[in-house]
Design a protein with these regions (language model features):
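Zn2+-dependent peptidoglycan hydrolase active-site motif and core
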Residues: 64-66, 79-127, 146-165
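A generic structural motif
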Residues: 2-3, 70, 110-112, 170-172
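Generic structural motif
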Residues: 44-54, 75-87, 134-137
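Generic structural signal for well-ordered beta-strand positions
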Residues: 8-9, 86, 140
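Bulky hydrophobic/aromatic "packing anchor" residues in well-ordered structure
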Residues: 51-53, 69, 183
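Short, small/polar residue-rich loop motifs at catalytic or cofactor-binding pockets
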Residues: 72-73, 127
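Well-ordered beta-sheet/strand-loop patches within structured domains
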Residues: 1-56, 63
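Acidic, glycine-rich catalytic/binding loops that coordinate metals and/or anionic ligands
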Residues: 14, 40-44, 126-138, 142, ...
Length: 187
């Protein structure tokens, strides 16, 4: 009913159900994460500021096929780009220099384009699982000192000795026929 052009009273004369209601949540917080890297932009794998303790170079008579980055024990490690977790090595404790062939706790990400892989070694904790899709900048682990690190966190010394991230970039599967490249070539 209208009075002087204003609606003043409404009466429901009927209703039609267009779509039945659903009494459950069908989708909660779904976000599509592409598993293919954007080769034009790579995220740095640690927070800043950081210190490079070893470069991609020869040392101690052998080639070091990665860069060692120090921020601090337990600091976050981030995926350098989108991809799929290709391998995870875990179960290592500080001081076990042979665990996972000296790599300690580690993650390898397949970036699913151009054969690019990144490796993250000597981790304290791991936040991902094999087969999981990750996005650039996503926290995947924390910095640690597992596996063969120098100085070794030996009994009676600092339990944080040798803390760093060994960050490597490969074209092809790391340690499986791939070729390592200088990580700085991406930045």
């Amino acid at each position: 009913q209208y009075i002087n052009g204003q609606l003043v009273d409404v009466a429901l004369v009927g209703s039609v159900e267009i779509k039945p209601s659903v009494s459950k949540i069908l989708v909660k917080g779904d976000k599509y994460i592409p598993n293919v890297a954007d080769l034009s932009y790579w995220a740095w794998p640690t927070k800043k500021p950081y210190t490079i303790t070893t470069y991609y170079q020869y040392r101690w008579g052998a080639f070091h096929a990665a860069i060692d980055i120090y921020v601090g024990f337990g600091s976050p490690i981030y995926a350098a780009n989108n991809g799929t977790i290709a391998d995870v090595g875990s179960g290592c404790v500080r001081g076990d220099t042979k665990c996972n062939n000296g790599r300690g706790n580690y993650i390898i990400i397949n970036h699913n384009i151009g054969g690019y892989y990144t490796q993250y070694m000597h981790l304290n904790s791991i936040n991902v699982r094999k087969g999981q899709t990750v996005s650039r900048g996503q926290k995947i682990a924390t910095m640690g000192n597992t596996g063969y690190v120098v100085p070794t966190p030996a009994y009676g010394s600092s339990s944080y000795a040798g803390t760093h991230l060994d960050f490597g970039v490969w074209i092809g599967v790391p340690y499986g026929g791939g070729t390592h490249i200088n990580p700085f070539s991406l930045y």
